From Swiss-Prot:
Superkingdom in the source lineage: Eukaryota
Subunit structure: Interacts with gpr-1, lin-5 and GDP-bound goa-1.
Protein name, as recorded: G-protein regulator 1
Keyword Cytoplasm recorded: yes
Residue ranges annotated for the GoLoco domain, each copy included: 424-445
Gene label: gpr-1
Length: 525
């Protein structure tokens, strides 16, 4: 049986539920979207393509909510589903998501194994050969990421990763020469080549390759590749070439603003701010950092906020604006209280207080009253009213106690002060006021509230064997096994099902460790 067709009628109810979940996610209602997706899996479907898509969205919403282990688990479910039905493009995308998530979680060996597995999967299947170029590019990217993150402390192992990357790039070039269908973009190849040369400390060759990539991308109107090439060229240049680094970052920001994503613009502004600070261009660095901070809060890109706050604080100290710097130092200290970077913020408050002491008369107390005026979104009254005293910066342990005190004070409920000579409230006025308010609420409901209602499942709540093996699968498992599937993937799924009887009920604990993470799609070579 051709698995591109499914046994049974099209599952219109599950599709309607999925559209409802996606709508909620697009409105920023991620918890609601997550709940709707869980309802779909509880409802169940026999449409394998649809179920793979459901897994993909569930993984994405978990990733957004920082439920990393659960996101990784469902990206693996997604990959298994698409590999079962020989959907090679989706299998490539699923593997890329798994690799990105695994690298985010610091699981380099897992990312590498999945990338290698994709090469095996595509090269051993007749209809998958045209996707092997994408698989090799992904594997090369993983090797470079591992080399860049110093996951291998042994220099010989790092050299081995670079050698593997070079081999994969050469294989992709050969693939492109012999295949027009599925050929990998030349700009992707050149970007990887240039990065490989940079990490191998062949800087002159790397610069030439990046420039070649930029010229080719402009000529072929691939402007997204232009800003990536400029950024990478700056990122991997020798650290003493500040003038050229800043120039390339400006070019990257220019092209990203016109042709890139908002996330790219934030990343480039953050990096440009750091390098301009290093070059002594304090005020311009401060302005770029402040712009990046506003965008970070708007887009929820919290992975950048600590670095940006630290850069802004350093710029303000260099400009002699210590009261304003203290505000950003406290913000950063609160955010990084349990992280290694907390010490970096302590070092800055120590610098600021020492400067303040040198400019304060001996008969006066050394202190800094917080000035939050540069922050357009400042609304934290607890921090705004705080005064940093010299004793607070005695050492990092003392500063940690002070910051923990601020955090504890923020958690306390705000006391409502009773106004003096306050007249008693007239009961009839209160009733009319509440009635009018309710009328306004009934007539001015926001459009976002009118999301399509969640369809109610009429399916049995009993968990079937198929549902335990793949959450949301409602099918006769004996009949499913008779269909034309990828046998190796099927065997892996069945093997795992014997080890775990987990079903959708296990998703109640969304942040638990994925104990099955290394035993999902591995194949023996």
């Amino acid at each position: 049986m051709d698995v591109s067709y499914y046994d049974g009628p099209k599952d219109e109810v599950a599709e309607a539920m999925l559209k409802s979940a996606v709508t909620a996610m697009r409105l920023g209602q991620y918890e609601d979207g997550k709940g709707r997706l869980e309802e779909i899996m509880e409802f169940g479907t026999s449409n394998f393509q649809l179920l793979g898509t459901i897994y993909m969205y569930y993984g994405r919403v978990c990733r957004h909510l920082n439920h990393d282990a659960k996101a990784l688990e469902f990206f693996e479910h997604e990959l298994n589903m698409f590999k079962l039905i020989f959907n090679y493009p989706e299998a490539c995308d699923s593997t890329r998501r798994i690799v990105e998530q695994a690298l985010k979680m610091g699981k380099f060996p897992k990312a590498r194994r999945f990338a290698e597995d994709l090469i095996d999967y595509t090269s051993n299947k007749k209809n998958g050969e045209k996707y092997i170029g994408q698989a090799r590019i992904l594997f090369a990217s993983v090797c470079l990421e591992g080399c860049e993150r110093d996951v291998e402390s042994n220099q010989d192992e790092k050299k081995k990763l670079l050698s593997i990357c070079a081999e994969q790039i050469a294989a992709v070039k050969l693939f492109n020469e012999n295949n027009t269908e599925g050929a990998v973009s030349e700009t992707k190849i050149m970007l990887l080549e240039a990065k490989c040369l940079s990490l191998d400390e062949k800087y002159e060759e790397s610069r030439r390759k990046y420039q070649e990539c930029i010229d080719f991308a402009i000529k072929t109107d691939q402007f997204e590749a232009v800003h990536i090439a400029y950024y990478d060229k700056a990122l991997y240049a020798e650290t003493d070439l500040l003038f050229f680094i800043i120039r390339d970052l400006r070019s990257a920001l220019f092209y990203a603003t016109k042709f890139g994503k908002e996330r790219d613009v934030v990343k480039y502004k953050s990096k440009l701010s750091e390098e301009m600070l290093r070059n002594g261009e304090f005020h311009e660095a401060y302005l770029y950092g402040l712009e990046a901070l506003v965008s970070i809060r708007k887009l929820g890109l919290n992975e950048y906020i600590g670095d940006v706050l630290l850069t802004i604080a350093k710029c303000l100290i260099a400009l002699g604006k210590r009261r304003q710097a203290a505000y950003f130092i406290i913000l950063g200290s609160v955010l990084t209280i349990n992280q290694n970077s907390f010490k970096l913020f302590y070092e800055q408050i120590d610098v600021a207080m020492n400067q303040e002491r040198s400019e304060t008369a001996t008969d006066q107390d050394v202190c800094l009253a917080i000035d939050s005026s540069p922050d357009p979104t400042s609304s934290n009254d607890m921090i705004n009213k705080f005064v940093v005293e010299l004793e607070h910066a005695t050492n990092v342990e003392t500063w940690e106690m002070i910051v923990n005190g601020i955090i504890d004070d923020q958690k306390k409920p705000v006391a409502i002060e009773k106004k003096e000579n306050e007249e008693p409230v007239d009961m009839m006025d209160l009733i009319f006021s509440m009635s009018s308010r309710m009328d306004d609420q009934r007539t001015e409901l926001p459009a976002a509230r009118f999301i399509p209602p969640r369809p109610v499942s009429s399916a049995s709540k009993k968990t079937t064997k198929s549902h335990r093996i793949l959450p949301g699968l409602r099918a006769n498992w004996t009949k499913v096994q008779s269909m034309k599937f990828d046998g190796h993937t099927m065997n892996r799924i069945l093997k795992r099902s014997k080890k775990s009887k987990s079903s959708l009920d296990s998703t109640n604990s969304m942040q638990g460790d994925d104990t099955r993470s290394d035993d999902v799609t591995m194949t023996s070579k």
